[in-house]
C-alpha cells in the first residue's frame, strides 16, 4: 500500500448478492495520499485524457488507464493508447493493486487486479448505465469483481440489474467509500447520474470526484 495508508470500514451494506458498499473505508489521511498519487500519475506521460467515443463525441470525464488502456472506440483493452496518442500504458503501481485486493477481500472476493481506470468527474460529468464486460471471458465467467474507490465529491451512483431495462437503485458514494461487485452481480448495469458539487472533504487536494475502478483482465 501507499506508505501509511490505513483502511477501516464504518459500514458494510450488502446492496445485492455479490455487491457490497463499504462506507468510509479510507480515513481522510489515506484519501489525501491516494489523491496525490493519482494526480502524480495523471500529470506524467500517458496521463489524464478525454476519451472520444464512437460517433466522435467526447466523454464528460477525464480518464487515466493503468495496466491496460481501454480503447473507447473498440471497447477493448490494449497495451498502447491507440485511440489517443499511441503512447505505452503506465503500469499499475503495486500499492494500488494491493489496495484493490484488500477491498475485494473485505467484500468477500479474491482477485488479482491488473487494470485500474481512474475517472475524473467535474460538476457536470455523467456516466451512462453500462456493463463492464470488456475484460477477458475467463475473468467475467469467474465473477472476478470490479472494485471501486471514491475520492472527492459525492456521486449519485445507479446500480441496476442484468438487463438495461431493469430498475436502478440510487446509491450515494462519498469520499473514502468502496464499492465492490462480482460473482452474480458482475454484469449488473451501473452508472453515475450526478455529482454533488462541493461535498468532498476540505483540503483533499482535488476538485470534483476521482473514481478508481480496478479489474482483473
Residues covered by each model-derived region:
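Non-heme Fe(II) oxygenase metal-center motifs and adjacent flexible, charged/small-residue loops
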Residues: 1-217
Amino acid at each position: 500500500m501507499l506508505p501509511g495508508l490505513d483502511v477501516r470500514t464504518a459500514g458494510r451494506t450488502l446492496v445485492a448478492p455479490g455487491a457490497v458498499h463499504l462506507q468510509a473505508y479510507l480515513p481522510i489521511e489515506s484519501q489525501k495520499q491516494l489523491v496525490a498519487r493519482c494526480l502524480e500519475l495523471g500529470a506524467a506521460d500517458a496521463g489524464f485524457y478525454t476519451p472520444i467515443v464512437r460517433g466522435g463525441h467526447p466523454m464528460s470525464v477525464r480518464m487515466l488507464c493503468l495496466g491496460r488502456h481501454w480503447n473507447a472506440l473498440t471497447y477493448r483493452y490494449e497495451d498502447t493508447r491507440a485511440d489517443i496518442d499511441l503512447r505505452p500504458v503506465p503500469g499499475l503501481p503495486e500499492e494500488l493493486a494491493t489496495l484493490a485486493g484488500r477491498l475485494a477481500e473485505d467484500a468477500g472476493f479474491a482477485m488479482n487486479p491488473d487494470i485500474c481506470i481512474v475517472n475524473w468527474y467535474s460538476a457536470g460529468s455523467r456516466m451512462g448505465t453500462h456493463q463492464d464486460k470488456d475484460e477477458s471471458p475467463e475473468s467475467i465467467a469467474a465473477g472476478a469483481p470490479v472494485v471501486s474507490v471514491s475520492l472527492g465529491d459525492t456521486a449519485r451512483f445507479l446500480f441496476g440489474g442484468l438487463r438495461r431495462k431493469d430498475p436502478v437503485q440510487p446509491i450515494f458514494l462519498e469520499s473514502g467509500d468502496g464499492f465492490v461487485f462480482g460473482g452474480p452481480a458482475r454484469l449488473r448495469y451501473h452508472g453515475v447520474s450526478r455529482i454533488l458539487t462541493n461535498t468532498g472533504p476540505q483540503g483533499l487536494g482535488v476538485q470534483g470526484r476521482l473514481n478508481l475502478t480496478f479489474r482483473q483482465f
